[in-house]
Amino acid sequence: MAERYGLPADVALVAGTTDGCAAFLASGASSPGDGVTSLGTTLTLKLLSATPVFAPQFGIYSHRIGDQWLAGGASNTGGAAIAKYFSRDEIARLTPLLDPDHPTGLDYYPLASPGERFPVNDPAFAPRLSPRPADDRVFFQAILEGIAAIEAKAYGRLAELGASRLASIRTAGGGAANAAWAKMRLKALGVPARDSLSEHAAVGTARLAWRGIGHAN
């Protein structure tokens, strides 16, 4: 390969990866059971596992990373479901009023439109967002609680399918900065939070190259 592209013979050539896998590596997650959730328009999960998981009916696939496997899945819940009911200004106003120590008990399944892929695979799956309380703060909190419950169910589903059980969580995406929501999520997940080393995929690519030339981490 070096000869083909006119590179010096002593140049190390290492394999690359996808941007999603690189972002996971950038987080610092390195042990089976380490999970990274991206709270964006949708809810995306990646979990480092000692064994691979392939479940096409849920859109679950696994990438090999060294002697471990990175299993991933995505739910249609997430920021799009929140944005359907609240503007950015309303979210900013309501967030300080959240009370994660007192759950609403409304058991929502927030979706912007019918259809779910993971942890439930049903293209006709209906959102569950009623009854709607008169207080917007309670409604907003119930939506966040619902997304947290879906996240916990999704990691549980990965374990049911053979992946390592979730042991710690790191978070990326716009929702990561919401401290009250983080508290709801940690309560639902039952695992400790870890700070990410970086959210930049380029850092993960550099770490992969570093390991590729013989370094442990």
Q: Language model features by range: what are they?
A:
Residues 2-169, 177-217:
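Active-site core segments that coordinate phosphate-bearing ligands/cofactors
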